[in-house]
Each structure stands twice: as C-alpha cells, then as structure tokens.
Amino acid sequence: MEGIIINELSLNGQFSDSQDFWKNGIPLFHKVLQDAQSFGIMYLFKKGNFYGAQATPDKTLHDLLTAPEARIIDEAKRYKSILARAICNPFWDDDPRQDPDAHYRVDEKEVSGSSVAEAAARSVCLLSFIRSPYEKNPIVVTKGEETTEVGNIWKEKQLYSILFERGELSLEKYITIRFSGGKLDFSLIDDTYGFSLIDDENRSEFIDSFRKVEELNWSAIITDKGLDYKTYNKNRRSRHYFSDEQWRKGIKKFRITQRNRCFGYVEDGVFYVLRFDLDHELSDVG
C-alpha cells in the first residue's frame, strides 16, 4: 500500500470544543498513525485544504493549532506536532487519480473531489476521525456502474485486518499483532504445531475463537460452552507433549472447532499459546 489518505469528510464539527478534540479525537488518530508507521506506511496523503476541516462547531483544524488553549491543554501540547504534520504535504490533489468527469457516491451521496473518491481511485485505505458517519469498514464507493470497497480505519489495530484481507500481511503476523497486548500471547508457539497448521479452510474459525477469548472476561471464558475451556491433564500418554516447566504452569485448552483445540498456559491473565491440535491427538489422551 503506497500510503493512507485522511478522510476530511469525517470531520463535521462533531467535537464539542477544543478540549474534546484534543482529549478524545486526536489520541485515537495518533494510534492509527502509529499502526501505519509500524508497517512501513509513511505517506499520509490529504486534500490540500484539509487544514480548514471543521473539527468543532466553531474551529477548524488550523484554528485548533493556533488557539491560545493549545498551549494550555496537556493533550494539545503532546499532539500538536502530530496534527501539524497531518495537515501538511503530501497532498493527493497535487496529482489526483480520480476521474474528473465521473460521479463518485457513497450511499447515494456525492463525494466526487473528496479523499473518499481519491482512495477508491488509488485503491488505498482511508483514515477517518471518530464520531462520524464514516465509522464503518469497508466504505462502498460507486462510480457509475462500478463499485469499489475502500478500507477504512478509525481506531488502532484495524489497519492490520485490512492489510490481511488485501493479502499484504501474513496470517501469522496478523494474528500475532492483532491480539498482542491482550489475553493471548503467541510468542511461545511451537513452529511445527502452530501457524503452519492453519489454512484457508480453518483460519476464520481460529480468528473467531481468538477474538472471542479477547472480548470475554476470564469468568465468561471459563464458563463459555462454545470455548469449552478446561484443564489438560498430565498422564503417561500426554506428558511428552509439553515440557516439565510448562506442565508446572498448568496446561489449559479451549475449542476452536468441534475437532480443533488450542493449548497453552495462563500467567498473569495472559494465555500463552503453545500449540494447536487439529486431529484430537492430544485431547484423546489428556
């Protein structure tokens, strides 16, 4: 992906005042930028007049940068440089790719000449602000009889899902990054019995189960019938599947599908994934 385009249409004065924007709007915007930079996406395109986008009922982005309160609000002092960079070069309208004679629409609304239309023309991703009608992914853009689905992000980690769907991110990297910092950790997974066992036929089930674990609290995980979370028992037939140190931590498992299972141990509220079982080999003996 050559870059990301900021969606000026996602700013319509939705932030109540300067403090609301600096405290609630720009921090999420910054987290999305960090995701892009971590993947090596360095170009942040925007329309040339983006500085004039209406962020609050009475202030544009330029106003927010130059207002006296920008020197007082802690978040403003922290993020001013981020916003300043966001309203500067590169501008996509220096070299527009959209057809000037075509009509681009979203939900029957004309968006020709906007960053939404440009993202469709360039096949790149949009970055939108929160609290707007553009909190959805994908954004479907029509150009006559032609329809284009434009990836759209407005909070952290969404970019990785879009890159994965576009085939620009491997399954292993997507899962590792997507679920990092939460209840799942894949840093200890076995190379032979790990990601290499996930294919096109079962990957959605794995991702759905990981997402479920991430969303539920531990009390709900333990009692959820779908996950069937339980202790895996050590015996003469099962002991060789894990090291003595891993057994001492207490091996657990949860269900991916009727046959597939995920094994690991829990430490400080994090499930460290060790391996998968796709043929009930482990489940049948422990």
Feature map (PLM): residue ranges:
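An acidic, glycine-rich, mixed-charge low-complexity segment common to nucleic-acid enzymes
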Residues: 1-215, 221-225, 229
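Compact nucleic-acid interaction/catalytic patches
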Residues: 106, 270-286
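Active-site-proximal segments of catalytic enzyme domains
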Residues: 214-253
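Short, solvent-exposed loop/turn segments at secondary-structure junctions
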Residues: 259-261, 278-279
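Active-site beta-strand-loop-beta-strand hairpin of nuclease catalytic cores
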Residues: 260, 265-273
